[in-house]
Amino acid sequence: MVYGNFTHSILQNFGDSDVRNSTNVADIADYLTTECHRLFDLRFSSPSAVIRAQAELLNNRFVSFATKQAARAADGWQIISSERNIPSGCKLFDSTFDISGIIDRIDRRDNEICLIDYKTPNSNTRYTQKSLFKNDLFTDLQLPLYFFLSDYLEDLKPHKVSLA
């Protein structure tokens, strides 16, 4: 949980940064690794060797992420929101209970919106065709909930919505 929250904090800051829509791999990787070191120093005063090793592994993953992110930006996708709150009081279909949540990231390209849920390697959930569906039914509800709750985000209408 700490690892995932730490990673999310770095990615949230990236999503709010000036380099979020850069197509330059080095700029993105530099931002992410610098931010990782900055937050690491703030959060862990006397980290164990295991924690330090996890941070270095995370930096390696950020370099890989930077390559994919730069390609995504070059393909026209722009990060428009990071850690976006879904307003309280949202109802799914005709349910009697309220749903709230946070969408990790929202990207836009022309009239398309992509709702993104970050997963860290320590997560039990991995979004693949096999993990998301069984007999054409969703097995993990987070992304489908994002999709339905995106109707409550007025600035996303009337865009085509995809999930990642």
Briefly describe each language-model feature range.
Residues 2, 6-90:
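A non-catalytic, helix-rich entry segment at domain boundaries
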Residues 7, 62, 105, 146, ...:
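Hydrophobic, well-ordered secondary-structure elements that form the walls
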Residues 7, 23, 33-34, 67, ...:
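Residue-identity detector for threonine
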Residues 17, 69-77, 108-112, 150-159:
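Secondary-structure transition/capping motifs at alpha-helix termini
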Residues 27-31, 79-80, 143-164:
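Substrate-binding beta-hairpin/strand module that engages nucleic acids
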Residues 81-153:
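Non-catalytic protein-protein interaction segments used by genome-maintenance enzymes to assemble
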